[in-house]
UniProtKB/Swiss-Prot annotation:
Effect of residue 31 to A: Loss of lysophosphatidylcholine acyltransferase activity, but no effect on phospholipase activity
Gene3D superfamilies per record: Antioxidant, Horf6, Chain A, domain2, Glutaredoxin
Biological role stated in the UniProt entry: Thiol-specific peroxidase that catalyzes the reduction of hydrogen peroxide and organic hydroperoxides to water and alcohols, respectively. Can reduce H(2)O(2) and short chain organic, fatty acid, and phospholipid hydroperoxides. Has phospholipase activity. Can either reduce the oxidized sn-2 fatty acyl group of phospholipids (peroxidase activity) or hydrolyze the sn-2 ester bond of phospholipids (phospholipase activity). These activities are dependent on binding to phospholipids at acidic pH and to oxidized phospholipds at cytosolic pH.
Protein name (database record): Peroxiredoxin-6
Length: 224
């Protein structure tokens, strides 16, 4: 798949037509975190459930200073008409308004630039459609996380919210989040921090799990 972004890459400052008008990506993001996520096609079952869940969680993302923006190879007109179905699926009034814009990428220019095309799934003209990609950008416009799902597997937007919590915490504190971590649970002290530094950084205390190797790398502390 041509194109694509690596962790640490700056987001391209592209211009695009969306359901809220024409945007320039960096201006849209401003000083916020941003999640750009693509879906294969409008008016399809899995995509409807995904964007419905994203809409439901939009207030939680907003609390975390995160802006959402979706993308597919469909037109703005299709996006707006489909938005009614998404709102109806959520049990809401079937309006054209969602809590985030959707990008019109009919020409696949952005999908190619960002490496979003699915090599397997095709449209009626045998052209590749967009895969289920998630890019999370920090306020510095740099890519902090990327996820790539095939068209047949819907994403878990609660998990995406969880990784935002992890990224925002670990970006400011010398900690890492362990498996299945959720906001408010204990975190792990990064190995580069000495015992003395850890004591100074974490006044709530540091617990070290004893291991057969004798190495003291499993160090936990309450979430700072």
């Amino acid at each position: 798949m041509p194109g694509g972004l690596l962790l640490g890459d700056e987001a391209p400052n592209f211009e695009a037509n969306t359901t809220i008008g024409r945007i320039r990506f960096h201006d849209f993001l401003g000083d916020s975190w941003g999640i750009l996520f693509s879906h294969p096609r409008d008016f399809t079952p899995v995509c409807t459930t995904e964007l419905g869940r994203a809409a439901k969680l939009a207030p939680e993302f907003a609390k975390r200073n995160v802006k959402l923006i979706a993308l597919s190879i469909d037109s703005v007109e299709d996006h707006l008409a489909w938005s009614k179905d998404i709102n109806a699926y959520n049990g809401e009034t079937p309006t054209e308004k969602l809590p985030f814009p959707i990008i019109d990428d009919k020409g696949r220019d952005l999908a190619i630039l960002l490496g979003m095309l699915d090599p397997v799934e095709k449209d009626d003209n045998n052209m590749p459609v967009t895969a289920r990609v998630v890019f999370i950008f920090g306020p510095d416009k740099k890519l902090k996380l990327s996820i790539l799902y095939p068209a047949t597997t819907g994403r878990n937007f609660d998990e995406i919210l969880r990784v935002v919590d992890s990224l925002q915490l670990t970006g400011t504190k010398p900690v890492a989040t362990p498996v299945d971590w959720k906001k408010g649970e204990s975190v792990m002290v990064v190995p580069t921090l000495s015992e003395e530094e850890a004591k100074q950084c974490f006044p709530k205390g540091v617990f070290t799990k004893e291991l057969p190797s004798g190495k003291k790398y499993l160090r936990y502390t309450p979430q700072p």
